[in-house]
Amino acid sequence: MVETSDEWIRERTGIGERHVSVGETVVTLASEAARKALEQAGKRAEEIDLILVATCSPEQYLPCCACRVQADIGAVNALAFDVNAACSGFLFALNTADAYLRMGLAENALIIGSEVLSKLVDWTDRSSCILFGDGAGAVVVERCKAESRAVEYGNALAETEEKRIPAAGILGRALHSDGTGGGVLQCGARELTTPYARTSAAKTDQNQPANDREHYIQMDGQEVYRFATRRVPQCIEEALSDAGLAVADIDMFVLHQANARIIDAVAKRLHADREKFPTNLERVGNLSSASIPVLLDELHRQGKLHRGDRIVLAGFGAGLTIGACVMTW
């Protein structure tokens, strides 16, 4: 199908295996993840009043995936809509839900990242088809009265300087978009026509794909690498500054699982211990918006996340988009 080898893929990406859905869709995967998250959180579907589905691979235009998930799981009281920020989607959705909770517009939110990217890759294109997998992950977040605790900084200043931060939840964030880089990573939709259109509209936007593979994911891998290794550390440092914390204060960095080399480079640029950057891409590949929640679930089930841990979530994707948030588990 494509000229490559297991050794070539592992050496350049760190990916050893991925999963391709057969019969499942973005919605069925999202609904399954949602049910498991609700069970783990001890919540009934009727208690959820906000559902956000982050995806860039929906199987239909209308209705949105979130509304279909709402119907599937019986969350009759939930406002539901989708968020498309590609691989940054889960972070953008999580911060959107956080805003709803802080404003008192919701009490319990369900955030899902779900992708079936196997249908969007050209299986003869070695630069993209080796990367992406299918899957979904979900989290439940709830509004609560923020407890506070003292956090000491430094050594000599520990007795005189302290900062009050919430005992749980998001402490700081940084979210950015750069539409000028849209052509770096893109996937065109099927052309839509009307009976009144005499000819197909010419593509004049340089950010729009214009070749025979326009309906598949197209990526400038080198440019994506340069963007990620430069901007992800900057975004993390910005979020840490917003939280009043430093790299050394963080127990774990949960990054979008795109490429092992990118994660290595981010850790190096932050001067952080590589052991604090867990990965699962060797088993699942790049799950786009699902990568962070799937990894969080694995870490939680493995007992590697503990109440009170300070963690950083960070991701980047098409748009170009990038985001990071600091939170207490």
Which residues fall in each region the model found?
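Short acidic, glycine/serine/threonine-rich loops at helix termini
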Residues: 62-64, 121-125, 322-326
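Claisen-condensing/thiolase-fold acyl-transfer catalytic domains that form or cleave C-C bonds
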Residues: 27, 31-34, 38, 57-58, ...
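Acidic-glycine-rich active-site phosphate/pyrophosphate-binding loop
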Residues: 2-8, 60-74, 111-117, 198-209, ...
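Short beta-strand segments
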Residues: 54, 84, 109-115, 141, ...
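Short glycine-rich phosphate-binding loop at a beta-alpha junction
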Residues: 46-54, 248-256
